[in-house]
Curated annotation (Swiss-Prot):
Family: Belongs to the UPF0297 family.
Signal peptide: none
Name of this chain's protein: UPF0297 protein PEPE_1262
UniProt-listed InterPro entries: IreB (IPR009309)
Superkingdom of source: Bacteria
Amino acid sequence: MGKLDETMFFDFGDNKQNDVRETLKTVYDALEEKGYNPIDQIVGYLISGDPAYIPRLNDARNLIRKHQRDEIIEELVRYYLSEQIADSKKEEN
């Protein structure tokens, strides 16, 4: 069997995760700069889907709308759980 007969695998997951992380950082900074509580505003957006929770400052509103809300939630859960697992392993040692 030649190399051309083998199934190729393409995974763009890490790039998408990094993109979501960068977007969340930008949105968080924009919300802080405007004087809003970033956590409350991001949660409001994720629950409602209403982009009015996110300011236009630094193009934050357009950036967050590039991602599906479920993708953002998935990344937040992934990050939270990985931190919790890492912390519990530190406590075991």
